[in-house]
């Protein structure tokens, strides 16, 4: 009798779970154009790739042509300490200890690699303190007093947009704040973080809702215009940093600044997307709506992120397409350049805000799960070991990558005359164009983009069902409140599938699905089988089995920890 009751109870749980989701799922038109199940399907082990990248690239004794990829810059800019330099691209002639006094290295590369490694469990303070070295990018010598893409103006014109291309000046501050979240006790970081937030707050006050500028001079505190497009999506970068500062330090000024910058972004009359910052606006919209009861238009910001409709930065967004039997959908970059040109770093970094966004608005669970499956599948093709040789510009030179460095991009038709007859998709990179006639062919391999692999590596795990991923919604949800383990699962198949989800041993949990608004399993101590309907999703939260459930406004909590931000939406 008892056995029958247990079996019946489990059966009812599965029935309840496979019913129509009570949180209505929203669409994103661009993602609707992507395949539910991309082909050929193969999800590589991004965590292992991130671990291998760190071990291989941060080897000062590495042998081989163009190796090692790191050096020590002893110029002591901004702080009396050395800083590690990381090549932007393989063989880049601008870089290394003997070029430009060893000073030309980019925060996008070093901060991205530091963050990526940390997210997969590597302590970047061991041996050398690579974390503390990042302080050298804090440009106090110029009185800008923010993190910048280089350590000083002496190398500004070599590339990387220093002091003239707004996203290049703002994005390193997001990277720094993410690293700060992971290393909160690093000496000097708190003061730097507050100084950056103060600068961004003051800039937002001066801008007063108008972000239609090419860059902002954070020394003179004046917005500037040059030949580069206006970049109003920088408001998303300001807002993300300011909200992170608010969560960290509790100063209402920072919240006010975040809301102001986000409102400026939302008020844009046309798609303001420029490079990488727009998805942070979508994430912040969902999060602030959930945490503060605001009504920011998350749907509009997600459409802007994906749909490829910006005018000045023409076509920038998510790519869609099957090129000669290879799905490249989900990669981010230009949707129009030579038929479409997706970039590795942009694709990796889009997951940083978009995946944790689902915690705060589970109505996007299915569509974001679908995008992530496409992006995770397509991103392997940036790597020469996974892209067929006939679709690469320099497969004969791939050995130099040591299996951890990818091409910078994937393009429909190569922009290089000598490769224009290759069939799409074509893996290539822009490195040779940066220093014409000097940068080698191998500079098509992107060290800077490859260093961000830890973002994917920290989020993506395969399940027992090929094609259904487990996506960790917490790893890149920086400066978040306490949360229980939370995962997104998307079923790309036209039939229901049963997925085995594991829990920590010796800890009994109840499993709650924020999409259906019910507990789907109780007192689980090892694993549980979860049924997911066709083309549906689940956001599973693993809460203490003996936890006390309470409600606050439209939130459901267990032991005073928010589990569902939108509980009252469920009918």
What are these regions (language model features)?
Residues 22-156, 185-213:
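Low-complexity, Ser/Thr/Pro/Gly-enriched N-terminal "stalk/linker" regions
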Residues 33, 37-40, 108-125, 169-187, ...:
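Well-ordered alpha-helical scaffold segments within catalytic/enzyme domains
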Residues 203-207, 215-219, 268-280, 284-433:
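Extended ligand-binding clefts on enzyme/binding-domain cores
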Residues 178-252, 260, 264-267, 283, ...:
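Active-site lining segments of carbohydrate-active enzymes
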Residues 2-10:
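Sec-dependent signal peptide recognition
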Residues 79-108, 150-170, 221-234, 265-278, ...:
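Solvent-exposed loop and edge beta-strand segments that line ligand/cofactor-binding
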Residues 523-570:
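C-terminal beta-strand-rich structural cap/linker in extracellular carbohydrate-active enzymes
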Residues 429, 433-506:
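Carbohydrate-binding surface patches
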